[in-house]
Structures are given as C-alpha cells and as structure tokens.
Curated annotation (Swiss-Prot):
It comes from the Eukaryota. It catalyses: Hydrolysis of proteins in presence of ATP. This is Lon protease homolog 2, peroxisomal. The keyword Manganese does not apply. One of its GO terms (molecular function) is ATP binding. It is found in: Peroxisome matrix. Its EC number is 3.4.21.53. A motif (Microbody targeting signal) lies at residues 771-773. ATP binds at G336, P337, P338, G339, I340, G341, K342, T343. Pfam families: AAA, Lon_C, Lon_lid, LON_substr_bdg. Residues 9-198 form the Lon N-terminal domain.
Length: 773
C-alpha cells in the first residue's frame, strides 16, 4: 500500500505496550470501542491497515501513533461473547491530525537527521548490541531485519528494532522514544537503555557466582559445567558413529548450531534432545544371526504344543533367511483368537535367531504421528513408536512384533495403516523417515512380524504386504498338555510355590477347561491355574503361621492334592461356572437347530430358533442379524417353498415365520448359517425335532447345493467344547477337515454333505424320512 501524506484509517486504542516500526505486537481486544472498530471495519473484508493509538494515564490520546499492518485477526466465542485478538506489524510513525472513532486521520512522520551528525561511538555500541540480540533471538525474521538495517545503514530502523527487544522500560519511556523523530537522539536513547539492560544482566550473573549463596553454588556446580560437558560428550558419541554422508552433514550441521546457541534459548533444548536421540539410535549396532534349524525346531517344540503347520512355515522362513543371509521378503502375520500363542511364537523366533525381541502394541492407535512421530516444530514433539522402540532396543536388526495391527483406526489425524506401508515395504524401508528424526534410518535389517485377531479388518494395501498364517484354537487334549507342561509351572514360579508342594491332577485340569472356560486359547485357563496357586499359597501361609520358626511345614501332608472337587470349591466363588447352552436347550423342540459360527474369539455354537403362527407368509427376524444372514433366511425359505411338494410337506406360505438367534446384543452376519436355517424351517414344517447332539454349518444355494465356508477347525472345536458329537460340514470343505488332528476327528462324527437333503437326513433325530429328490 502506498501511504499518502494524510490518510484515514481505523483506529485501535491501547493503554499498554507500544508498537515500534519494524516490530510486532499481539493486541487482545477488550474494550467495546475497539471491538466496534474490528466488527465494522476489519472483519468484513475492510482495510488490512490500522492505526495503533496510545491512551495516557490522563485518558488523553498521545499525539503520535503507529501505522500497522494486520498480520492475523483471531476471533472466538466464549460465554456467548465474541472476542478478538490482533497480530500487527509496525510500519511507520504517524501524527494524529483528527480523531473521530472508529477512524482517525493521520499524517506520516519522517525521520530527521543527517548521517554526518551521528556519533560513531554510539553507532558502534548500538550495532554491537544489535548483533548480540540477533544471535540470541529465536526469530529468523528479526535477525535478518537487524542485519539488513546494519548493511543499509538504516540506523533509525536499527534503533527501533533494538528498543523493541528491551523489556524493562516504562510505557512512558516507550512513548517518548516513539515520539522522537531525530534519529541521533533515538540512537543515544537506545545506547543508554541497552547499557542499562547489560548491567542488570551482569548483576544477576554476579549474584549467581559461587560463594554468594548456597543455592546458586549448587546450580553452578551442577548445571554450568554439565551444560558444556554434555555438548562435548554428545560430540564424542556422534563422532564415533558411522553415518551416511547425507546424515552426517545434517547431524554435524545441527551440532555446530547447538555450539553457537545460547543455552537459554528454547530451541537449544529442542536441538539438544534431537541430537541425543540421534546419538542413542543403533545406527551400526547389530546382533549376529545364529540360525540353526534344528535348534529353532527344538525351541518351537519346547515352547508350543501342536500348531505343526505354523511351526513348519516358521522354519521355512528361517531357512530362507539363513540361505540368503537376509530377512527381506514377506512379512509374517499370525492371525487367530486371543490367547493361542501368537506373541510367544514371535518371541521363539527371536530366540532361535539369536536376535533381540521388541514388541510395539498398535491397538487403538488413531493418529499417524504415533507411528511416524511429530515434526520438531510442534510443542512437546517426540519420535514415533518405531524409532522410540529402536532406541530402547539398542539393535538395528531385532525381531520386531507389530501387535494387534487389525486394531488400527483411521481418523482426522491420518491413517496409521498407511504409515506402516513404508515401514513394511522392502523397497522403501532402507530410508525410513520419522517426522521427528527427519533423516533417513535403515530399518531393512529388522524382521517384522505382525499379529491380528481379525484379518478382514486389515486395510487392503497393508494386507497385501503380509503373509497371513492362520492359527486355530486348541482342542481339549492340547489344552490339557499346555496346562501340564507350561501353565502350571509358570504360575507356580510366579507365586513362589515349589512344584513339590502341590499336585494338580488331570481331572482337575479338565474340569477347569470344561466348566470354567469358554475360549479358543488358554488365557482364562492360566488365570484359573493362578487362582488355584493362590489357594495353595494361602494354605501354606496358614500352616507357617502356626510355627514360624519351623524348618518344615507342620501338620501338613505334602504335596497338596488338588482334584476335581477342589476345583469346584476354589473357582466357584471366583468365577461363574459356565453353563453350556447346548445342555440348557435340550431337548430340542421342532424348529430349533444348532448352527456354528466363528468370531475373533474362536468358534461358537449358535442356536437357531424358528416358530410359526397363522398369517400371510411374512418373515420376522430378531437377534441383531446382518444383511447377509437375513438373505440366507430368504434363500432357505425359498428352497423350502420350491421343494415342499416333493418333500411331502405343507407349505409355510399360510404362516408367519419368526426366526431368532439368541444373544441379541451380539452382531451376527455371514452366509454359513444357511444349512442351519434350512434345517430349522424343515423341522418346523414337519413338526419333527432335530438331533440334539448335532450341529451344522454351510452356505446354501437356491437350488439346494451346500457351498464351502471358512473356519472349519474353529467350528469343530466349538462343537466339541459344547459336547456335540456330530457335525455336518460341506463336502467342499473336506480338505480343511482332514487337516484337523486325527484325535479330534476320531472323537467327532463328521458328515460331509453335498446337498440340503443330505444335511437334513444327517440332522434328523430318527432314521431319514426323506426320499432323494
């Protein structure tokens, strides 16, 4: 904007703080007069320039004002009142010619003085002080303005900039300086005030030297030497690290900045923290791989029961790593219900390779910055979880477990899943960029392993980078072995009880599994074992209290025998005994069938109930059913309607049908309930109950074909846990069924069906009554 000799501009009146040309000022708007000026002339696309006028203690307006540029205008509402704040930059001195709120007419004031009149000693003192201010300033813009003023010999502007940084002046002194047109006088005032400020700081430092007081002495001993030593130690650590050329240039450039910086500047601490992080990262520190396949096989066998397919895939992965001497390739992702050993498998892999193990929990993360860190410009910025974990690990090639990757959520702060893509891509992760670190760090030597409960919740791009290894739940036999070989010893050690003091028999373990757990894994089972150990610990403590000086436990038969009756006494008070839904619903009435489903917690038996009443053929569904499940009901009813005559059944078109799946608070969806729904409707139409010891799963087509489903092992194990002995599966799932342990297959009566008629025959209580269509 070109300023004329006289102009009219909006006016803001302040009674504290003086804006000098070249300086900046934040002005909170409190008075109604200033608020009106803003609302009438500044908030509606008005002028970007304003006059800052100054009110004296006599309520008069000082005759000299400042023409300012509005850099930012803030507005917010609090208690139904709109508040404003201005960020302004001083441009020129101005004389107030006429004041008529909310505007005033001003004329620009020019500096008066010839350079020849300046006192060279005064100029040198001001320039010297100005350079110190520029060096200590946190504002690059201010430092640049100082140097430009010195280069251009603009001493009036230089004096204004220097005085704007002096904090201990009175309001009236600032106004006197603002009203002084003569540059030489302003330089003298500036020199005088800067000298006063230096003397004040010197006095403060003198008070802090050793001997004046105990507290400054401690500060002097602890802080002042350590500040210098800390930088020297930091330089030694950084010099010992072999950086790449790009990283080295950046790190030592920042170290040079730190050395030339005043420790009292706020950026000093930020830069120091950044350099300390760089020095603590494992740039060149690695562990030597010690991959022996036989040793790895033994570690996996000793630490985990069954899971032969998973162990085989892990050994194959380790074999490739040994041959290639590299871990680049597919990233393993173990998926399955909680408590089945996904994390412990990753620990076993680290042990078998001789590498350090580092776990990062990703559950519930919504902010990309949790993965990649915050930029250093933010207050309280910190590195992301990956870099932070590497700092604690002190190795650049650990086995890195990304736990619960399916629990990542996208939000307004970005997508954490997308942030993992660079980390897990072998073509990019040699130059991984954390926002806080802001220099490339090589994470390509890390072996990444992920875990998830529900693989369907993974982002497609992230899922594409992972090799999914499914881990199923455990059978009763496997749980008993795990409990005997691992859980009991672990809990006894945790509770400091000698194995010689207690004997937990197999029937007690089976009772804990059957009656007090309902899970695919063994997490709740371990809690139950812990409860038994606490009961034993109490009995031992009570015996010791009777004779504390005894070398042996008095009046006690050891080991303490824990049988099935003891389990009921110990756990009944602590855990509600599990009631099997199968037992509760027997005997089954017509229209009721046991289906099977899979959740993130493993397989479960899902009762299906159907009832009818006179009506018009309407279908009512309850139980929090999803769209796919509701369509399966329509398919089952459509098949029954099309084949009712051939089956010799009365049509259900004259009845309203109500289909309900219990546990109404739980979402249910998926196509695998099709065969169960068809069986329930046929049973309802015939008035004949289905077998109460059988469960069924499978998708059906409208033409009566039974289609393949997923989660075969989980569903068979769920039926086994509930005491069901017959399971009807689709014929097309035979291959998955044969992968189940032979012991389980021998216990269960599994029928493989091709058509809906095969399913109904297998599910009938008595001999089949249906003829083949």
């Amino acid at each position: 904007m070109k300023f004329e000799e006289s102009m009219e501009l909006p006016v803001i009146v302040v009674d504290s703080g003086v804006l000098l040309p070249g300086a900046s000022l934040k002005i909170p708007i409190r008075s109604k007069l200033n608020t009106r000026t803003i609302e009438q002339h500044l908030t509606r696309g008005g002028s970007n320039y304003v006059v800052i006028a100054y009110k004296l203690s006599t309520d008069k307006i000082y005759n000299v004002a400042t023409i300012a540029y509005i850099e930012k205008l803030f507005g917010w509402t609090f208690n139904s009142t709109t508040n404003y704040s201005l960020d302004v930059i001083g441009l020129h001195r101005a004389n107030i010619d006429k004041l008529s709120f909310p505007k005033c007419r001003v004329s620009k004031l020019e500096d008066s003085s010839e350079r020849a009149e300046f006192n060279h000693s005064t100029i040198e003192n001001v320039i010297s002080g100005a350079k110190i201010l520029a060096q200590n300033s946190e504002s690059l813009k201010f430092s640049q303005e100082i140097h430009n003023s010195i280069d251009d010999h603009d001493y009036g502007k230089l004096a204004d900039l220097c005085v704007s940084q002096i904090k201990n002046l009175e309001f009236s002194q600032f106004l006197d300086f603002l009203g002084t047109k003569n540059v030489e006088k302003r330089l003298e005032m500036c020199e005088k005030w800067m000298q006063m400020q230096r003397e004040t700081k010197a006095l403060q430092l003198k008070m802090a030297v050793p001997g004046n007081s105990e507290i400054p002495k401690k500060i002097n001993k602890q802080r002042i030497p350590n500040s210098k030593n800390q930088v020297e130690q930091l330089e030694e650590k950084l010099s010992a690290i072999e950086f790449s050329e790009e990283v080295s240039d950046r790190v030592f450039s920042e170290l040079h900045r730190l050395k030339n910086m005043n420790p009292q500047q706020s950026e000093y601490t930020v830069l120091m923290n950044w350099l300390e992080l760089v020095s603590n990262l494992p740039w060149n520190t690695s562990t030597v791989d010690d991959i022996e396949i036989n040793k790895a096989r033994k570690i996996l066998e000793d630490s985990h029961e069954s899971m032969d397919d998973v162990k085989q895939r892990v050994l194959e992965h380790l074999a490739v790593c040994k041959i290639n001497n590299s871990v680049k390739g597919m990233i393993l992702c173990f998926t399955g219900p909680p408590g089945i050993g996904k994390t412990s498998i990753a620990k076993a892999i680290a042990e078998s390779m001789g590498r350090k193990f580092q776990r990062v929990s990703l559950g519930g993360i919504r902010d990309e910055s949790d993965i990649r860190g915050h930029r250093r410009t933010y207050v309280a910025a910190m590195p992301g979880r990956i870099i932070e974990a590497l700092k604690h690990c002190k190795s650049n090639n650990p086995v890195f477990l990304l736990d619960e990757v399916d629990k990542l959520y996208s939000g307004n702060q970005g997508s954490p899943s997308a942030a993992l893509l660079e980390l897990l891509d072998p073509e990019q992760n040699s130059t991984f960029h954390d926002h806080y670190l802001n220099i490339p760090f090589d994470v390509s030597k890390i072996m990444f392993i992920a875990t998830a409960n529900d693989v369907e919740r993974l982002e497609p791009a992230l899922k594409d980078r992972l090799e999914i290894i499914e881990m199923s739940g455990y059978s009763m036999k496997e749980k008993v072995k795990i409990c005997e070989n691992h859980l009991v010893n672990r809990q006894l050690s945790k509770h400091c009880i000698s194995p010689d003091y207690v004997n937990l028999d197999r029937h007690a373990i089976m009772a804990m599994i059957e009656e007090f757990t309902m899970e695919a894994g063994v997490r709740q089972l371990e809690r139950n074992v812990g409860a038994v150990c606490r009961h034993v610990a109490l009995r031992l403590a009570e015996a010791l209290n009777s004779d504390p000086s005894a070398d042996v436990l008095p009046d006690m038969d050891l080991p303490i025998q824990i049988g099935e009756p003891d389990i009921h006494k110990i756990l009944k008070a602590k855990h509600m005994k599990r009631v099997k839904i199968v037992e509760k619903m027997r005997p089954l009435p017509p229209g009721v069938c046991f289906g099977l489903s899979v959740t993130t917690n493993g397989g479960r038996v899902m009762p299906i109930e159907a009832s009818k009443c006179k009506g018009t053929g309407k279908i009512v569904t309850t139980g929090h059913l999803g769209k796919v499940l509701e369509e399966s009901i329509l398919v089952a009813k459509g098949w029954l309607g099309a084949n009712a005559e051939k089956l010799g059944l009365k049509t259900l078109e004259e009845n309203d049908i109500h289909v309900h799946l219990p546990a109404g608070a739980v979402n249910k969806d998926g196509p695998s309930a099709g065969t169960g729904l068809a069986c329930a409707l046929v049973s309802l139409a015939m008035g004949v109950p289905l077998r109460s010891d059988a469960a069924v799963t499978g998708e059906i087509s409208l033409t009566g074909h039974v289609l393949a489903i997923g989660g075969v092992k989980e569903k068979v194990l769920a039926a086994q846990r509930e005491g069901l002995r017959r399971v009807v599966l689709p014929k097309s799932n035979e291959e998955e069924y044969l992968k189940i342990d032979e012991d389980i297959r021998n216990e269960m009566d599994v029928v493989l069906a091709d058509t809906v008629e095969d399913v109904i025959e297998a599910m009938m209580e008595k001999e089949p009554v249906l003829a083949k269509l």
